[in-house]
């Protein structure tokens, strides 16, 4: 059994060595391509944040996606200002439940209704 294990181990090592050499060969062409691209386009990949124009636009502050977002933000600002001019909080309501005796008498109407005339035709 030990002979079989020894035979399998060298085969595995050679397979691993082949993979290592393939990876190294695969990396070298990639490095060469990267070097060519960097030589052709030197300004790419230098700034992680992007172009100066993009950075300037991002630093200006909050921007809105469309007019709907702008209008919603504008409405929120108005809603924050409205409660400051709210009603007097000392006013108490609902202490007394009115009864028919407490209500003032209705004023009679100057024009009589044909329905309330009482005449039957």
From Swiss-Prot:
The modification N-acetylserine is found at residue 2. GO terms for molecular function: ion channel inhibitor activity; phosphatase inhibitor activity; potassium channel inhibitor activity; protein phosphatase 2A binding; protein phosphatase inhibitor activity; protein phosphatase regulator activity; signaling receptor binding. Widely expressed with high levels in skeletal muscle and brain and lower levels in the pancreas. Residues 1-53, 79-121 are annotated as: Disordered. The modification Phosphothreonine is found at residue 21. The keyword Repeat does not apply. GO terms for cellular component: cytoplasm; nucleoplasm. Interacts (when phosphorylated at Ser-67) with PPP2R2D. Interacts with ABCC8. Interacts with SNCA; interaction is disrupted when phosphorylated at Ser-109. Belongs to the endosulfine family. This is Alpha-endosulfine. It comes from Homo sapiens (Human).
């Amino acid at each position: 059994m030990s002979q079989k294990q020894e035979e399998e181990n060298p085969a595995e090592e050679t397979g691993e060595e082949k993979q290592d050499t393939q990876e190294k060969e695969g990396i070298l062409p990639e490095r060469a391509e990267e070097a060519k691209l960097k030589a052709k386009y030197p300004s790419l990949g230098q700034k992680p944040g992007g172009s100066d124009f993009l950075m300037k636009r991002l630093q200006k502050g909050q921007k809105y996606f469309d007019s709907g977002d702008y209008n919603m933000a504008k409405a929120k600002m108005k809603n924050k200002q409205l409660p400051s001019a709210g009603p007097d909080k000392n006013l108490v309501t609902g202490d007394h439940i009115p009864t028919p005796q407490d209500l003032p008498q209705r004023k009679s109407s100057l024009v009589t209704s044909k329905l309330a005339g009482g005449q039957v035709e």
